[in-house]
Amino acid sequence: MKRIVTGLMATLLSLGAFAQGSIPILDRVPDHRVQFHYTYSLSQGGKPMTQVTDGDVIVEDNAYRLSGLGLEVRSDGTTRWSMDRAAEELLIEKVEKEDLFTNPALFISSYKGYMDRIRVNASSANSLDVTLVLDEETSARFVLKDIVFLDKQGKSDFTMDVKSLPDSFVITDLR
Protein backbone atom coordinates (compact mmCIF):
# COMPACT_ATOMS: atom_id res chain seq x y z
CA MET A 1 0.00 0.00 0.00
CA LYS A 2 2.81 2.42 0.83
CA ARG A 3 4.28 1.98 -2.65
CA ILE A 4 0.86 2.59 -4.26
CA VAL A 5 0.27 5.74 -2.26
CA THR A 6 3.73 7.18 -2.67
CA GLY A 7 3.98 6.20 -6.31
CA LEU A 8 0.65 7.83 -6.98
CA MET A 9 1.56 10.94 -5.04
CA ALA A 10 4.98 11.20 -6.64
CA THR A 11 3.37 10.91 -10.04
CA LEU A 12 0.60 13.36 -9.33
CA LEU A 13 2.60 16.00 -7.57
CA SER A 14 5.28 15.93 -10.22
CA LEU A 15 2.91 16.31 -13.14
CA GLY A 16 3.18 20.08 -13.20
CA ALA A 17 6.95 19.85 -13.23
CA PHE A 18 6.88 17.63 -16.31
CA ALA A 19 4.33 19.60 -18.28
CA GLN A 20 6.78 21.85 -20.13
CA GLY A 21 3.76 23.42 -21.85
CA SER A 22 3.08 20.32 -23.94
CA ILE A 23 0.03 19.04 -22.01
CA PRO A 24 -2.19 22.00 -20.98
CA ILE A 25 -3.96 20.19 -18.13
CA LEU A 26 -0.61 19.73 -16.36
CA ASP A 27 0.22 23.43 -16.41
CA ARG A 28 -2.62 24.06 -13.94
CA VAL A 29 -1.54 21.56 -11.24
CA PRO A 30 0.87 23.76 -9.20
CA ASP A 31 -1.65 26.59 -8.74
CA HIS A 32 -4.68 24.55 -7.67
CA ARG A 33 -6.12 21.95 -5.37
CA VAL A 34 -6.72 18.98 -7.67
CA GLN A 35 -9.38 16.32 -7.15
CA PHE A 36 -9.76 13.12 -9.21
CA HIS A 37 -10.53 9.41 -9.32
CA TYR A 38 -7.64 7.02 -10.06
CA THR A 39 -7.12 3.45 -11.20
CA TYR A 40 -3.74 1.86 -10.46
CA SER A 41 -2.24 -1.24 -12.02
CA LEU A 42 1.22 -2.76 -11.88
CA SER A 43 3.12 -4.67 -14.55
CA GLN A 44 6.35 -6.61 -14.30
CA GLY A 45 8.42 -7.76 -17.24
CA GLY A 46 5.79 -6.31 -19.58
CA LYS A 47 3.07 -8.56 -18.13
CA PRO A 48 0.17 -7.12 -16.11
CA MET A 49 0.00 -8.23 -12.50
CA THR A 50 -3.37 -9.02 -10.96
CA GLN A 51 -3.36 -6.07 -8.57
CA VAL A 52 -5.70 -3.31 -9.76
CA THR A 53 -6.77 -0.63 -7.31
CA ASP A 54 -8.94 2.45 -7.55
CA GLY A 55 -9.80 5.36 -5.30
CA ASP A 56 -10.20 9.10 -4.94
CA VAL A 57 -7.57 11.74 -4.28
CA ILE A 58 -7.35 15.41 -3.38
CA VAL A 59 -3.92 17.04 -3.75
CA GLU A 60 -2.68 20.50 -2.85
CA ASP A 61 1.03 21.24 -3.08
CA ASN A 62 2.79 18.43 -1.16
CA ALA A 63 -0.32 17.52 0.87
CA TYR A 64 -2.88 14.88 -0.10
CA ARG A 65 -5.91 12.89 0.95
CA LEU A 66 -6.40 9.48 -0.62
CA SER A 67 -9.11 6.86 -0.19
CA GLY A 68 -8.90 3.37 -1.63
CA LEU A 69 -8.41 -0.26 -0.60
CA GLY A 70 -10.60 0.45 2.43
CA LEU A 71 -8.03 2.93 3.72
CA GLU A 72 -7.95 6.66 4.14
CA VAL A 73 -4.50 8.24 3.92
CA ARG A 74 -3.82 11.88 4.70
CA SER A 75 -0.57 13.81 4.63
CA ASP A 76 0.18 17.46 5.29
CA GLY A 77 3.64 17.03 3.78
CA THR A 78 5.39 16.29 7.07
CA THR A 79 3.15 13.66 8.72
CA ARG A 80 1.19 10.79 7.14
CA TRP A 81 -1.90 9.26 8.79
CA SER A 82 -3.10 5.90 7.39
CA MET A 83 -6.48 4.84 8.78
CA ASP A 84 -8.42 1.61 8.40
CA ARG A 85 -11.86 2.39 9.86
CA ALA A 86 -13.08 -1.22 9.59
CA ALA A 87 -10.11 -2.52 11.61
CA GLU A 88 -10.15 0.58 13.84
CA GLU A 89 -6.44 1.17 13.30
CA LEU A 90 -4.44 4.32 12.66
CA LEU A 91 -0.76 4.46 11.70
CA ILE A 92 1.05 7.79 12.06
CA GLU A 93 4.40 8.24 10.30
CA LYS A 94 6.83 11.02 9.58
CA VAL A 95 7.18 11.78 5.87
CA GLU A 96 10.81 10.95 5.11
CA LYS A 97 12.48 13.81 3.30
CA GLU A 98 15.33 11.70 1.89
CA ASP A 99 13.33 8.93 0.24
CA LEU A 100 11.78 9.43 -3.20
CA PHE A 101 9.13 6.77 -2.55
CA THR A 102 7.93 8.25 0.73
CA ASN A 103 8.26 11.95 0.00
CA PRO A 104 6.56 13.26 -3.14
CA ALA A 105 8.01 16.73 -2.52
CA LEU A 106 11.49 15.33 -3.10
CA PHE A 107 10.30 13.94 -6.41
CA ILE A 108 9.16 17.42 -7.45
CA SER A 109 12.36 19.15 -6.42
CA SER A 110 14.50 16.48 -8.10
CA TYR A 111 12.30 15.89 -11.14
CA LYS A 112 15.04 16.54 -13.69
CA GLY A 113 16.77 13.35 -12.64
CA TYR A 114 13.60 11.30 -13.14
CA MET A 115 12.15 12.66 -16.37
CA ASP A 116 12.99 9.44 -18.20
CA ARG A 117 10.89 7.48 -15.68
CA ILE A 118 7.48 9.08 -16.36
CA ARG A 119 5.31 8.91 -19.46
CA VAL A 120 2.15 11.04 -19.59
CA ASN A 121 -0.65 10.89 -22.13
CA ALA A 122 -3.58 13.30 -21.96
CA SER A 123 -6.60 11.13 -22.75
CA SER A 124 -9.10 14.01 -22.67
CA ALA A 125 -9.60 17.45 -21.16
CA ASN A 126 -10.09 15.96 -17.69
CA SER A 127 -8.19 12.66 -17.70
CA LEU A 128 -4.60 11.43 -17.91
CA ASP A 129 -2.85 8.11 -18.42
CA VAL A 130 0.44 8.14 -16.49
CA THR A 131 3.10 5.41 -16.41
CA LEU A 132 5.81 5.55 -13.76
CA VAL A 133 8.78 3.26 -14.40
CA LEU A 134 9.85 1.93 -10.99
CA ASP A 135 12.79 -0.16 -12.22
CA GLU A 136 13.87 -2.00 -15.39
CA GLU A 137 11.20 -4.68 -14.96
CA THR A 138 8.38 -2.94 -13.10
CA SER A 139 6.07 -0.08 -14.01
CA ALA A 140 2.97 1.39 -12.40
CA ARG A 141 0.11 2.76 -14.49
CA PHE A 142 -2.25 5.39 -13.13
CA VAL A 143 -5.35 6.41 -15.04
CA LEU A 144 -6.65 9.68 -13.60
CA LYS A 145 -10.27 10.54 -14.41
CA ASP A 146 -12.72 13.28 -13.56
CA ILE A 147 -9.92 15.74 -12.80
CA VAL A 148 -11.30 18.91 -11.21
CA PHE A 149 -9.24 22.01 -10.42
CA LEU A 150 -10.29 23.90 -7.29
CA ASP A 151 -9.01 26.97 -5.49
CA LYS A 152 -6.32 26.27 -2.92
CA GLN A 153 -7.77 26.03 0.59
CA GLY A 154 -4.79 25.29 2.85
CA LYS A 155 -3.64 22.11 4.55
CA SER A 156 -6.25 21.70 7.31
CA ASP A 157 -8.12 19.06 5.24
CA PHE A 158 -4.94 16.96 5.08
CA THR A 159 -4.40 16.45 8.80
CA MET A 160 -6.18 14.11 11.19
CA ASP A 161 -7.69 14.93 14.56
CA VAL A 162 -6.55 11.82 16.41
CA LYS A 163 -8.36 12.86 19.60
CA SER A 164 -11.72 12.68 17.80
CA LEU A 165 -11.33 8.94 17.12
CA PRO A 166 -13.19 6.46 19.35
CA ASP A 167 -11.25 4.92 22.24
CA SER A 168 -11.50 1.54 20.48
CA PHE A 169 -9.00 2.66 17.80
CA VAL A 170 -5.49 1.23 17.99
CA ILE A 171 -3.12 4.11 17.28
CA THR A 172 0.49 3.40 16.34
CA ASP A 173 2.65 6.51 16.25
CA LEU A 174 6.02 5.88 14.54
CA ARG A 175 7.17 9.49 14.39
Model-derived regions: residue spans:
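Short, surface-exposed charged micro-motifs
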Residues: 54-56, 70-72, 119, 139-141
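An acidic-aromatic
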Residues: 56-102
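Non-transmembrane domains of secretory- and envelope-associated proteins
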Residues: 124-175
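Bacterial N-terminal signal peptides
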Residues: 7-16
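A generic structural motif
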Residues: 39-45, 67, 83-85, 133-135
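N-terminal leader/targeting segments and the immediate start of mature chains
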Residues: 15-50, 62, 163-175
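Positively charged n-region of N-terminal signal peptides that target proteins for export
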Residues: 1-4
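Extended beta-strand-rich segments in extracellular/periplasmic secretory proteins, especially
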Residues: 61-63, 105-139
